[in-house]
């Protein structure tokens, strides 16, 4: 189970990294075009909505990563240890 969790963790970290990079690029684009009028205001509004959704998803991904890390690092109780302590 631990190996499966480590694989899941790696996939989540990869997805979160990719999403964070896209967020940074979108933020940079929005910042650069904040006062330029070469883009339709409706497009800017939609990009800001997209950014909000992406940020929410990124937050959820990072929370899932932390939960999975804790699960992977949680000490395991061995059945033999339980029998010895009884």
Regions found by a protein language model. Give the residues of each.
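Extended, charge-rich alpha-helical interface modules
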Residues: 1-86
């Amino acid at each position: 189970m631990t190996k499966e969790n480590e694989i899941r963790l790696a996939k989540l970290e990869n997805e979160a990294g990719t999403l964070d990079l896209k967020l940074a690029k979108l933020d940079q684009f929005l910042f650069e075009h904040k006062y330029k009028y070469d883009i339709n205001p409706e497009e800017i509004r939609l990009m800001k909505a997209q950014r909000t959704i992406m940020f929410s998803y990124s937050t959820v991904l990072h929370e899932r990563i932390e939960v999975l890390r804790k699960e992977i690092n949680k000490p395991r109780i061995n059945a033999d240890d339980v029998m010895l302590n009884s």
